[in-house]
């Protein structure tokens, strides 16, 4: 969800009019567009990561290879027609949306990007939308949100379920780990539900609903989806309480300023593609699938090899299992397959569970400790010897020579002991001692 880079702010006056005719595009290249106003202020905006996605990587996805094809009856020409500003304004105004879709030069730049350089990507996304848009609409409807939000994943991920951004956001809706967990998605070393289209869509709808309760403005909601509500509140504060996206624009993070224009352009391109000679890829919807619950760990390769199912298809149907391991031991976990394959799985599940299990699911629960007995004896002997030596030194006897004129009391005092102890150590019953003799003091 990281998207734009800004060098110099456009003036607030320009923003108040939504860039309508005062901004001018100076240049546009593969990664950024430079905009200048009539005061000479310049602004560089990076395109979202998804707008730089290589179309070949999109076409290499399993569902693209299996179910999408070029429409031979539609001639997609490379010529992108040029229309007047009035045409774009009217088309955006005519969109059946709750959210406002204003026109300005920034929006125009993103429209040109989608309908120009990204024509093949739009063709792919129009075909792939047959898989995902019904899921998005179902989740958005459940939270009573505007259905035009279904195009948010266009700018987030280019409808690539396994997309991962440079910042670590993942899935169609590009959740960061913390936000994903906050909205109930399981994320660990084996499972990443950010990649599950259904679960991630409901989590995204929930998050968008919460953001609208905070801001009550859909443009601010979209911006907050990109940079977080706290950052939007800071921008509002710096803009003296203004709650219009285009008025707080100068105070937004660099990566957020192209976000709303990109969203507007995505709605335009996914609606008016015909007017720009873009042909959607034909989509042959796959047969319906179902899930089977497993309560033991299982690897997708075990299923693939025993049931002769394309492993790539299993991965496509179960994108949340990031290492192909379904952790059924932790809790009952679903595996999505064709209904006929589920029947075969149930019939052969014992064989499937046992197939290459020691190779694919090696995870020891107990381990034996290997002991070298010869080393152990030597080590133990050394420890005992060291202990004995320490004890011997601490308990070693000590004797001193009795001086002329010495008494037991004087000897005891010099050596930190008592007369009674001297008598006990030396077997003395009285005080009779002789100078020059040895007496034990310890």
Question: Whereabouts are the PLM-identified features?
Answer:
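Bacterial N-terminal signal peptides
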Residues: 8-18
